Amino acid sequence: MGDAVQARPGDDTPIAVPSGQPVTLQEVIWNAPGPEGLTVRFRFVAPQIAPVGGSVDFETAVADMQALCDSYARPRLADLGPVPAQIIISLSDVAVPFGTAAPEATQFFEAYSIADGTCQWEMF
């Protein structure tokens, strides 16, 4: 794998979350340094977080992000290589290329570490 940042595109298969909103994987980015060391980013599109026309507020989205970390991201870590120090789960109402400023997009981010086989929320 080397030291290069790697990305794997997602697909349009809906992923179940507690709120019931439609969520799809945009991409997974790994082998990228983060503030806590090796970081894996799972980036999801969740149109219902949009401020206009959306039905999911931030507090509801937080529960969805925890569920995505526990039931989607964490089980897939073994397929990506070394266990990361941190997992970032992001939701965006529209697909945004990684590293691109998109002030028109609504985006939520949460950071997690893995402890005792579960995702532990971290201050981000």
Q: Which residue stretches match the model-derived regions?
A:
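Polar/charged, Gly/Pro-rich intrinsically disordered segments
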Residues: 82-124
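Generic alpha-helical propensity signal that fires on short helical segments
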Residues: 41-43, 60, 105-109
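Generic secondary-structure transition motif, activating predominantly at the C-termini of alpha-helices
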Residues: 33, 73, 113-116
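Surface-exposed beta-strand edges and their flanking turn/coil or helix-capping segments
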Residues: 38-40, 54-57, 102-104
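N-proximal, solvent-exposed amphipathic alpha-helical segments enriched in charged/polar residues
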Residues: 2-39, 48-50, 123
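Mature extracytoplasmic domains of secretory-pathway proteins
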Residues: 43-88
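A generic short-segment signal for beta-strand/edge and adjacent turn/coil regions
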Residues: 6-14, 54-61, 113-115
